[in-house]
């Protein structure tokens, strides 16, 4: 079975959960994909979240270049968020000939076209299904399954965090602050929820 070593960059709420899944379900994912997936690096400046989750400290790496220089790393998962640092990380990974997976819709909204072209010119892929709909496979359906259709409208929940908060406020009479705190406790909102609750995430 062919193998793919993964460098996960950014170990916050989403990154930590992703690392846990990659470690916990390694055999299951390898069987389902036909590819031996291995989490090789967790790259971040601060490993407080990673340590709190009990992740393997042997995987911790502060220097992205170390991960990119590893010839066994074929996939970089970008979970830093924002656009500036995330763009730099993504470009560096693509230049190094690594496939990139990102859930960063802000990055894609601002630089998606350029990054996709950059990936193609380096013979690799940038995958971003996780950036929309909580990973529901809608992007591939639109790109592949509906390629011959004229899509005139899409309806759905624009932001899961806001949807949760508003549902709690309407159905349970929760105060905004309490609903937000509960969302954060349940991993449905980042420690800094500004991007979600300001409407910027929805705009992206």
Residue ranges and their predicted role:
Residues 22-26, 119, 146:
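Active-site catalytic pocket residues across diverse enzymes, especially alpha/beta-hydrolases
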Residues 99-101:
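A short hydrophobic/small-residue beta-strand
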Residues 1-95:
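N-terminal glycine-/serine-/threonine-rich beta1-alpha1-beta2 phosphate-ribose binding loop
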């Amino acid at each position: 079975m062919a193998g793919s070593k993964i460098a996960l960059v950014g170990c916050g709420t989403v990154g930590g959960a992703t690392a846990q899944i990659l470690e916990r379900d390694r055999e299951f994912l390898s069987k389902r994909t036909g590819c031996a997936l291995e989490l090789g690096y967790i790259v971040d400046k601060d490993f407080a979240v990673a340590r709190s989750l009990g992740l393997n400290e042997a995987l911790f790496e502060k220097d992205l270049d170390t991960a990119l220089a590893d010839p066994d790393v074929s996939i970089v998962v970008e979970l830093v968020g924002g656009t500036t640092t995330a763009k730099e990380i993504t470009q560096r990974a693509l230049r190094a000939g690594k496939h990139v997976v990102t859930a960063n819709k802000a990055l894609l909204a601002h630089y998606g076209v350029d990054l996709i072209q950059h990936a193609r010119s380096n013979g690799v892929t940038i995958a971003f299904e996780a950036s929309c709909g909580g990973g529901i496979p809608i992007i591939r359906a639109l790109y592949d399954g509906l390629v011959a259709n004229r899509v005139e409208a899409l309806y759905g929940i624009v932001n899961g965090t806001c949807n949760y908060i508003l549902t709690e406020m309407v159905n349970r009479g929760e105060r905004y602050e309490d609903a937000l705190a509960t969302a954060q406790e349940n991993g449905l909102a980042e420690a800094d929820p500004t991007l979600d609750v300001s409407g910027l995430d929805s705009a992206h």
